[in-house]
Amino acid sequence: MTLNFNPLETNLVNLAIVIGVLVWFLRGFLGGILDRRRQAILQELQDAETRLKTATEELSKAQSDLAAAQQKADKIRVDGEARAAAIRSDGEQRTIAAMAAVKQGAAADADAEAARIKDILRREAALAAIDKVLSDLPSRLDDQAQARLIDSTITNLENA
């Protein structure tokens, strides 16, 4: 097998013509396919960038909403703790006031009862003394002593 280097005898010219025609026809066809593919890829990239930008904006908004919600939750927690402390303090003060009122009422009741008992004892002592004096008076008071008592009482009444 020998190589034939004679261009006229070979199909080089034919090959060049066929290759030229193929390149000329396929350039439009393959170029269109490649151009459409390039446009589709560029469009997908633009869509991805748009979605990324939208997602970034939504993430930023969600993060700011989360921060605001956390601040609101912290404020609610602090307000709740303050309110619970105020309610607890108010309850303690009411309990102390109620206990003081009960104690004061008990002391007043005890004082009133003591005063009532003192009055009863005074009356009973006075009645007992009067009864004793009335029982002892006739034996101790003779006519002469009775006259002196009456005179001294009249003198005391005149001086008064």
Curated annotation (Swiss-Prot):
GO terms for molecular function: proton-transporting ATP synthase activity, rotational mechanism. It comes from the Bacteria. The keyword Transport applies. It is found in: Cellular thylakoid membrane. The keyword Protease does not apply. The chain crosses the membrane at residues 13-33. Keywords: ATP synthesis, CF(0), Hydrogen ion transport, Ion transport, Membrane, Thylakoid, Transmembrane, Transmembrane helix, Transport. GO terms for cellular component: plasma membrane-derived thylakoid membrane; proton-transporting ATP synthase complex. InterPro entries: ATP_synth_b/b'su_bac/chlpt (IPR002146). It is a single-pass membrane protein. Pfam families: ATP-synt_B. HAMAP family: ATP_synth_b_bprime. F(1)F(0) ATP synthase produces ATP from ADP in the presence of a proton or sodium gradient. F-type ATPases consist of two structural domains, F(1) containing the extramembraneous catalytic core and F(0) containing the membrane proton channel, linked together by a central stalk and a peripheral stalk. During catalysis, ATP synthesis in the catalytic domain of F(1) is coupled via a rotary mechanism of the central stalk subunits to proton translocation. F-type ATPases have 2 components, F(1) - the catalytic core - and F(0) - the membrane proton channel. F(1) has five subunits: alpha(3), beta(3), gamma(1), delta(1), epsilon(1). F(0) has four main subunits: a(1), b(1), b'(1) and c(10-14). The alpha and beta chains form an alternating ring which encloses part of the gamma chain. F(1) is attached to F(0) by a central stalk formed by the gamma and epsilon chains, while a peripheral stalk is formed by the delta, b and b' chains. Belongs to the ATPase B chain family. This is ATP synthase subunit b. It comes from Parasynechococcus marenigrum (strain WH8102). The gene is atpF.
